[in-house]
Amino acid sequence: MARRNLLIVLVGLLAAAAPSAMAGQTQVAVAANFTAPAKEVAAAFKDKTGDEAVLSFGASGQFYAQIQQGAPYQVFLSADADRPKAAVDAGLAVADSRFTYAIGKLVLWSKSLDVTKGDETLKANAFAKLSIANPKSAPYGAAAIEAMTKLGVYDAIQPKIVQGNSIAQAFEFVDTGNAELGFVALSQLANVTAGSRWLVPAALYAPIRQDAVLLKTGANDEASKGFLAFLKGPEARAIIEKYGYSLE
């Protein structure tokens, strides 16, 4: 009887362990502006499928350089459309997997100044430091320079600019007071009440189309393909919209 009971317990334990043992995992490179929504999407994906999306955050340009060098990412969520396209063109990504998962919005934010009329704040130039993300590796940084150029203030402000390696660091400079104001992604302010902000008019910068792509390293991985499919679905799209992004 004891042996039979032990057998029943073991069978039960094996059955309980089976789903986790079969669960997949995908390595995802995520543009820093998408940090908070990506965490929510990954949690919802795991709840629904049991598969885990392991997220790494940083600047899109830095990720693309790492992918070119053979970094083991399987999915790439960029802050632009150019780098995922380049990955496809270079044979590093699956050709028909690329799609726009979000369209980003640029914001001028300050914890100490009133920037609700951001164009006037920039033209007045009465501040010491303004932060942006590195325009060479972060699309939001390039958008910030484009906006300032169209406003005719870039040349005057340029000596005051401090650059973060990513949009996350640009946010951190303002958050810690190392810059009085800075250009960040609207998504980064979803849960921030401190300070004031100015939503930069869309006419001042090219649309920030954020594309996702399945890398060749994940071409045969079900968790990687499943994560991208989930990202296109209604649950993920609701999360993305909650953080202020537009959708196609």
Residue ranges and their predicted role:
Residues A23-F57, G61-Q69, S78-A81, K85-G91, ...:
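Exported/periplasmic ABC-transporter solute-binding proteins
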Residues N5-A17:
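Bacterial N-terminal signal peptides
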Residues D96:
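Short active-site loop at a secondary-structure junction
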Residues M1-A2:
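N-terminal secretory signal peptides that target proteins for export/translocation
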